[in-house]
Amino acid sequence: MQYVPLRSKYKIGTRQSELALVQTESVIYQLHKFYPDIEYEVIKIKTIGDKNLLDPLANIGDKGLFTKELEVELDRNNIDFVVHSLKDVPSTVLPPNMIIGAILERADPRDAVVIAPWHKKNSLNELPHGSVIGTSSTRRIAQLKLNYPQFIYKNIRGNMNTRWEKLNNRELGYDAMIAAVAGLQRLKWNDRISEIIEPDRVLYAIGQGALGIECRHNDIDTIRMLSVLNHEPTVIRCIAERAFLRRIGGGCSIPNAVRTIYNEKGLVMDGMLLNLDGSRFVKDHVENLDLTVPMTTTKHATTFFVSNSDDELLSIEDETQLTNRSSNQRNLKRKRTESDIDSVLIPPPVQQPPTPPSSTTSATIPSITTTATLTETDVIPLLRHYAHVCGVNINETLLENAELCGTNLAVKLMQLGADSILEEIQQSSVVIPTP
């Protein structure tokens, strides 16, 4: 049975660019299919990233460059939710009272080459050596330098329209620019795409191509209203990607990249971390992971989990280990409340190991069935989420396993030397916030 919203009007926060407004209107269009009588008011807000168009993003020295001001208005209850390009939403720093309430079906996550119109060329390989390629993304620059060392890479800031104008100004010296395929297509600029770069050359950004909707974690009405927009395969992929980034650390200043595929065979995920000039990198993958099987079973122990890992999310414990733990050492386990809207964290009984979620979802929350006696100190109110994503109506085993997959892949990169690359980046001349 479809949820009936409690309000007749919702205020939507968005950036002021044409692309942001197009994306917001696309969300309103989808919502009208389910709630034709609801009114939506669009509130335009300028962010730090919109105000500072001179410095490279990595040099501004802040996370949430395109989200912070929107979150301030959300926190003040001036708006009800925000439409983001999910790649702009930090995985490591999200205000504690905010959550991603829905993720829509992902568009093409790849990067595109847009060549200046006076060049009669169709790909990067056709451009002469020394051509100037415009991009402000450290992820793109590092991978492009690795695969196309013959070019010069130059900062090109601004929204999509501004960057297009800069590319068309011959005095500025750009021969091409790199942009997300999804953004170009949403603006109906398909004819400006000269080449699409395949992920085997340039992996894409975490969440690229997906729209995420951020709201207050205690605004259950909005969360339920938005849940109809969740696209399960996209949610699962993006949770894995965001968990990967959260474990690696960093934001737009750190060249990290992914590729994910989720189908009937399971999840395939590639992850990569590079230094700023692409001369050093670590890369690994996990593949064919059946997310319907709890990751804490032995089925995945040899093919999935990292040996000698100190990461709490990746530890495997047998019943004996759990029984021998003291009460203050027990891992917290997610449990349901009698409410159908919130969940809590409570310690599991010492006598038995944690039981992974089965086929229940966030939309169906039964009563607690445990012999443990709970007190106020035992129960901690917490909205159920995975990498800050609330996947209402999606099997929670899938969501939890997707989060574990991303975390595991990040730990594998750490064991391959990601820590030393991160240290090199932090000591470089680029101003980078500590992850």
Summary of predicted features, one role per range:
Residues L86-K87, L94-Q150, P199-D200, L211:
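A conserved helix-loop-strand patch within extracytoplasmic ligand-binding domains
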Residues G64-N78, N169:
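Short, well-structured alpha-helical segments in soluble
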Residues E25, K63, R76, S85-L86, ...:
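Short, small/hydrophobic-residue-rich motifs at membrane-helix boundaries and re-entrant hairpins
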Residues V72-E73, D80-V89:
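A short, hydrophobic beta-strand-centered structural micro-motif
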Residues M1-D55, N59-I60, T67, S85-V89, ...:
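Small-molecule-sensing regulatory modules
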Residues N77, G130, G278-S279:
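Detector for glycine-centered tight turns/loop "hinges" at secondary-structure junctions
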